[in-house]
């Protein structure tokens, strides 16, 4: 008994009463604390496979990046090319050997476009292609340091966490900050009026975007003994996005500013008005309310137009689309879903009317199958193997058809149309 009481860790010297567990080897003992410390040292020092995977030699070129974006994003051809080149140049800059006479500056990106045009998807898909950590934040939740809410640097904490605290990997990651336009307020007279707290957030963003060293607080599961770690944002690709509602008026005002009354007056036709975002310049964003210093650190300005009805139809065919997702979910219940081209066309028409872009397509599709999903176990037990949607079920005369294992088919008389999205689902 005396011998057991005197047992101690062969590494730190603590006796068994001072630790939670003491593990015995052939001739040595190790406590739980030394095991944890040793594991952290090994994991921290171990080179990350992900951080080694991206280099100048295997960096995807613009054509390859664009092709990958095409798999997930419909339309926006020019925007995808600009985006691909900008991302390629950013990472070339990271891997380019430093030379005294040439300093390559960061090329952060500002995406401007209406809701549902795919701003977030652009950033997320790029990170997927490059296999780098990706953190997203909503600018509306960000506040200046000292105020209630998340400060701007919290997004870097998130990036580091997603990189499993691999500092080198995180410092090559991508940060997307959405709704940055909400930090730039405008008055009813269309004159930009700065929101003091919003401008404070912009100033804090400026510091991160241009590249600085900050101290990041480490959370639970940290690999380092310190509570803080220094993080250099110089090589992080920052992508800021926003709808900038009403910026078209700013563009139109700029385009007509130099016009004169009479025969020489500049007239903007209807087609040009529908494509005003394609003429967006940095000065328009500044006039909207972003501070010039921040806009200057976002040299790549990319505008995204609303998708056409035909393009919204294509959204149902891209990789990981909403149709494939609901089909997979019901396949688990051993029920096959079938949609006709008329159904797809109806979805696109409804999405156009709702004016929420590609984002609404997923909701529209999901609402159509909600009642089938609710009754799936019951339908499967009754012998239903397939459900066919010939139209979008906006009314009870357009409900789906049930196909049974014996080959018989019946109109789904029990189908229920849920209110909500379908209240606006008109095809007239």
Language-model regions: role of each:
Residues 2-24, 29-33, 39-43, 47-135, ...:
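AAA+ P-loop NTPase nucleotide-binding core of proteostasis motors
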